């Protein structure tokens, strides 16, 4: 019987997601056993700086990917939104399970909705994508950076000077928080999600045929098609989770993939948004990126990167 070694970050959410995947794979094929190996990533080590200032891609996956290439682990469970658009040679996304809730969740002290927050309210987030879209909706808000896991952020909301914080609905759901804790689920029209938000990525070596066969049984085709379109868009835009870029795809009534992409200035003053539909995920992502680049999206990303590097 083969023991499959699974790499995971040490956070409660990461371990919970990894255990969920292992349970599902064990149900599909009980002849395998699994062993979790916890790995600390660069993104986990740097908690006193915003992610946008840390820079680079793969802040939460690079060390885990290296362990896979070294054969210390066989596979890894990641949050898809942490995955860079391009993978290291030799590694593949072996499986994309069914997606969780894609929305961002607003949690406020008095259970107020976004439009009900007082003028100048302090909102905590670690994401330029979220802050840019919030500022477009409510330019009067004060954005204050916040890092740490879900429990830490909820504690900071209670004890520090935040009026509200924004978290991914998927993370709250996976950690067993009830929907009652959420003041408002922000619609994709208000706050377009990050590429891959709510989805998991199970990564492994491309030559591990046995494992790839097991993982193929756990892939959700709807999620796979839509997420691949989003990731193709991200790749063409040369984006990362450190810049204000968003992408969300669904299947429309004609059974086509419908992808909306968004790039914003950090202050939310400039937002470029485009929707493209079709049947081929790669082609749709590429087309959406091209249409947005023609409207100045890449120049906007370059400006954000330049501004961040000079701070």
Curated annotation (Swiss-Prot):
PANTHER family: PORPHOBILINOGEN DEAMINASE. The modification S-(dipyrrolylmethanemethyl)cysteine is found at residue 241. This is Porphobilinogen deaminase. Its cofactor is dipyrromethane. CDD domains: PBP2_EcHMBS_like (cd13646). It comes from Bacillus pumilus (strain SAFR-032). HAMAP family: Porphobil_deam (MF_00260). Belongs to the HMBS family. The keyword Transferase applies. Pathway: Porphyrin-containing compound metabolism; protoporphyrin-IX biosynthesis; coproporphyrinogen-III from 5-aminolevulinate: step 2/4. Tetrapolymerization of the monopyrrole PBG into the hydroxymethylbilane pre-uroporphyrinogen in several discrete steps. The keyword ATP-binding does not apply.
